[in-house]
Structure formats: C-alpha cells, structure tokens
C-alpha cells in the first residue's frame, strides 16, 4: 500500500471519527461503528494521521488545530516538545519573553506554573496524538494480514513516542489504550507503569521484528523503534528508579552493527554534519536514497506544499535566523525571520577553542559586541532584550551543493547550491519559502554512539576503549581533536552531546539524567530564576517535572498534581 501522499498530507482525519478539539480531555476511543472502515484507503488514511499528528497542528492547514485555547503554531507537537526541552536548559533563550502571556519567558527562566499555556498545549497535544493512534489500533484489531500487522506496529511505535514524551515531561500520565471500552475515561498512571508499558510495546515490536528493517521513506522502521527503546533505557533510572545501562548499550550495539560499512569512516554516519539539517536531508531518513548514510533513525517528514506547519523545522529555521542586517533570511531558504531564538553564554562557550569544529559553521559572529563573552561569540542586548544570546544556525531550508568536494567551510553558505557573482558575493540558487521541506530528525545514529559512551561512563558497562572510540568518532566527523582516555568524563560527554545535538530537543532530559538540572550538583546558568538576571539563580527541584495543567485537574478531579505545584 502506497502511504506516501497520506504521510505527507495526513489523509482524511474525519475518517477517524475524532473530535475536533481535545481541550476537554475527550480522549476515549470512539465507537468503531462510526468509522467508515469500508473505504479501501481507510488504513492508509488512518496511519497517515498517526504520522501527521506529530508534524502538523490540524487537518485544515497551518492555522488549524485540534488543541483549543492556544495558537495553532505554538501548540504544534514538535514545537511544544522543542520548547519544553530546550528553553529551560543551558542552551537557548527566546528574546521575546512576553509571548504567549509570558509563558515562554517563564519557561526560559524556569519559573513556570500549572497555568502555563505552552505546558497546557504540550499535554493536550500528546494526549490527542495518543488518541489518534488508539483509534487506528482499535479499528484494525481484527486484521491479521502481514501489511496490517506492520502498520499496527508503526502506530504502536508512534504512540510509544508520545507516551515517552509524556513521562519525560510530566512523570505521571493520562493513560488509555485501544483496548478500553467505548466511553471509558483515561486514568492517571504512574511514571513507572507507563515506562513498563512503553518497554513492553517496543521490545515486542523489535524482538519479534514486527516492523520493517528497510522501511519506506518517512515511515518508522526497526532502527527507529530500537533507538526509542535505547533512549528509554538511557533514562530508566529517572523514569523507573532502576538504571538500565546494560540494556541501553545492548540496543545501541544492535543499531550500530546494522549500520557498519558506509558513511563516515564506515560508521554509518553521514559524512557531512550540516547536510543532516537542510532541505534534502530526506536522503538520510529511514527509507532515504543514501543507504550508506541513513543516519536519521527516526524522523518526521515535512514538505512545503503538502505539510505546512509553524512547528517542526519551519519554526526552528524562522526563529533562529535574525534581522536581515545580520543574516539575510534568503540565504537560509526561509522567507520569514523571527529573530527569536539565541544561544546563551554557556552554549557558546562549548565551542570556544574548537576553531575547526564544523557544527557551528553557520553561526554568526562579530555583531553587537557589547555582550562579548569570549573571543569568538557575541551576545545581544539593547534592542534584542537582555538575553546574552548568540545567533545559532543549524537547520535551514537550503539544498546540498552538487559537489561535496568543493565545500569550503570558511564560507558557510557554500555548503548549499549557488555560485559567486562577479563581485565575489555568494548568490544562493533557490527561492526562499515560508514553510520548510526539511525533515526533522527525532533520533540519529550519532546519538546512539554517544549513548554507548554514556553507558560506560555512568554505568561501567562495555569497554573503555570502545566508549572512547565512539565519542571520538563524533568529534572526528565534526573536525575536533580526539579526547584521550583521561578526558572520558561526564562533563566532557555532556558538552559533546550539546555540541552534537543542540536544537534536537534532548538537552533538558540529558541534564536531568546527569543530575545537572536541579539538585546539589546543578550549575547556575544565565537567566534562570529571572528572565532579566544575566547571572542566573539555582533552579527549584520541582522543575524537574512540568505540572499537570489546571485544565486537566479541573476536568479529572481524581488526578493528582506533581509535587511543588
């Protein structure tokens, strides 16, 4: 069955029988008899919605949403995950802190409350996606053909991803599956219970190979499912109270083994880091054309004509490029420039002294020098707000140059199609658009290599030399010098994860797992505690979890709030 157009456009959501808004927690499965399962395209339509529920905010274009009470773009799935994962961390700030009634500024400063609108949007977005997946699974429960079994496995992985985000962000979770009776209400389940459910689901799918090792483009396959399981085990001590380093490392080894032979130094990694985040990164996706470098193990497809969303890469690109006097937005394939996201001092300092590292090649240096925190990076004050921010570019709407051998990293824009004019000015060869066709990575192979190393450092499992080799593989691809054995430390690992994975929605989780976000070992970062405080203050322990939104507690009086709220 060809799902391509359904994965891109999302199919006909009304065929699922879903309500148009989940703001009232109306998430129980609908009566399957209300769904027209006689439509020959029903399964493709329905599975397409399971995918597009992560990509878009609603079924009627970029301005529609099935989450009420919040701007559709702001409440888009991947955008809410990004916002809650990156803004409270030691990487980013949003320079318009009063946006969304101050909710964004509170996230940056780690001073949010249970009435925060972004937190509300994330909770309901996750539950809405879980409901969509449940609906598909309920309506295909009796089908036993091989194609449907695989489609069901994909929907289960996508649902597991939403439940993973739920326990990562909120701890306890509203919980319901496709086996619930019609009219049955979701109940509140503990973090441990949902952790066990996710583990059971993913282990069955991976170990029984219910999902393809060679999926079609845009669909989740064996690598994506096992990578999500590895990430679950990586954070097991936080989620379940019991570390699972050996289990995480074993899953990493499986994935690494399947990718040996091609790409950078035969590792399966893409040869060029920044190619992973531009418009034709589709070749690195599951089912992508570059089989030797399929580094993106789990990703979400976007298309500027068929998947228009102010979440995902469109949000990241538009928010990170800034005023045209600093970075002409056309140079990055985007017709919008929001001048919103900047890197804070701690993020900038991680690249200090690494002059050959390619991962910051699109960053902008040498402007607004009144807040220059180092010899390399420059902050923004005055008209930019008290942010200490740095212009950090990673995702673009550009396409890869046709001649990779000609890439000149001293002129970052030559990474992409174009040519120098008679005056020596680089002229990009593309039209800037509002919406990006860049796909969004969820888990990459580079993360798997770093997970293996962390399992050794934190759990003492595996070999020291192998752990060192794997982190140095990531550094070699970036152009940074190798660590020696004595440098295999938690601090260096965390800095390397930030350099490699910034803007990929993992930093808050990394900090919590390594006891650096709250508690006695936390580091004090800029802006924390007060959006106008450049020095920052310590973060209260309660902020290791987000609160259950007030709207949920009002509609479900038996639900309990997280401690401290």
Task: Locate the predicted segments by residue.
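Conserved, well-structured interaction surfaces
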Residues: 40-48, 52-58, 92-170, 185-193, ...
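Extended ligand-binding clefts on enzyme/binding-domain cores
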Residues: 263-400
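Structural register within alpha-helical repeat arrays
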Residues: 159, 229, 236, 445, ...
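Flexible, polar/acidic helix-loop-strand segments at domain edges
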Residues: 97-113, 121, 346-444
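Short coil/turn linking the two alpha-helices of tandem helical-hairpin repeats
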Residues: 167-169, 174, 235-241, 458-461
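Long, intrinsically disordered, low-complexity segments
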Residues: 20-22, 27, 40, 126-127, ...
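Membrane-proximal, proline-rich intrinsically disordered regions
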Residues: 21-78, 552-565
């Amino acid at each position: 069955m060809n799902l391509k157009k359904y994965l891109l456009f999302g199919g006909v959501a009304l065929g699922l029988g879903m309500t148009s808004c989940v703001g009232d927690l109306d998430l129980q499965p609908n009566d399957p008899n209300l769904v027209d399962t006689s439509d020959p395209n029903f399964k493709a339509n329905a599975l397409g919605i399971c995918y597009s529920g992560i990509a878009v905010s609603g079924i009627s274009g970029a301005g529609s949403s099935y989450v009420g009470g919040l701007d559709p773009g702001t409440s888009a799935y991947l955008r809410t995950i990004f916002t809650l994962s990156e803004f409270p961390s030691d990487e980013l700030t949003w320079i318009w802190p009063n946006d969304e009634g101050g909710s964004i500024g509170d996230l940056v400063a780690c001073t949010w409350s249970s009435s925060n609108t972004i937190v509300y949007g994330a909770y309901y977005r996750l539950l809405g996606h879980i409901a969509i997946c449940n609906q598909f699974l309920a309506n295909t429960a009796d089908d036993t053909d091989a194609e449907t079994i695989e489609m069901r496995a994909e929907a289960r992985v996508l649902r597991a991803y939403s439940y993973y985000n739920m326990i990562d962000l909120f701890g306890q979770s509203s919980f319901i599956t496709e086996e619930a009776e019609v009219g049955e209400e979701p109940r509140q389940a503990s973090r441990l219970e949902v952790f066990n459910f996710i583990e059971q689901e993913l282990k069955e799918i991976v170990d029984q190979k219910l999902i393809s090792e060679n999926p079609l483009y845009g669909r989740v396959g064996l690598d994506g499912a096992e990578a999500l399981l590895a990430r679950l085990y990586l954070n097991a001590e936080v989620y379940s109270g019991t570390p699972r380093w050996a289990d995480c490392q074993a899953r990493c080894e499986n994935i690494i083994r399947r990718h040996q032979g091609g790409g950078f130094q035969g590792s399966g990694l893409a040869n060029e880091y920044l190619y992973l985040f531009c418009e034709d990164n589709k070749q690195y996706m599951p089912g992508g054309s570059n089989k030797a470098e399929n580094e993106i193990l789990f990703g979400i497809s976007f298309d500027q004509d068929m998947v228009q969303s102010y979440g995902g890469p469109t949000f990241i690109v538009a928010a990170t490029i800034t005023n045209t006097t600093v970075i002409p937005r056309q140079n990055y394939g985007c017709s919008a420039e929001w001048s919103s996201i900047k890197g804070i001092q701690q993020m900038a300092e991680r690249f200090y002294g690494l002059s050959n590292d390619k991962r910051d090649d699109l960053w902008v240096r040498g402007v607004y020098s009144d807040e220059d925190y180092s010899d390399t990076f420059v902050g923004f004050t005055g008209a930019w707000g008290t942010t200490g921010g740095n212009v950090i570019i990673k995702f673009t709407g550009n396409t890869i140059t046709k001649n990779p051998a000609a890439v000149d990293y001293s002129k970052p824009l030559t990474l992409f199609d174009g040519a120098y004019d008679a005056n020596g000015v680089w002229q990009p060869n593309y039209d800037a658009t509002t919406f990006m066709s860049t796909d969004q990575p969820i888990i990459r192979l580079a993360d798997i290599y770093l997970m293996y190393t962390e399992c050794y450092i934190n759990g003492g499992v595996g070999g020291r030399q192998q752990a060192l080799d794997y982190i140095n593989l990531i550094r070699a691809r970036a152009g940074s010098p190798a660590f020696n054995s004595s440098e295999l430390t938690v601090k260096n690992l965390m800095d390397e994860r930030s350099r490699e994975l910034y803007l990929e929605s993992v930093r808050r989780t990394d900090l919590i797992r390594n006891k650096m976000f709250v508690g006695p070992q936390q580091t004090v970062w800029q802006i924390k505690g007060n959006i106008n405080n450049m020095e920052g203050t310590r973060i209260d322990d309660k902020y290791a979890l987000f609160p259950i939104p007030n709207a949920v507690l009002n509609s479900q009086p038996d639900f309990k709030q997280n401690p401290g709220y």
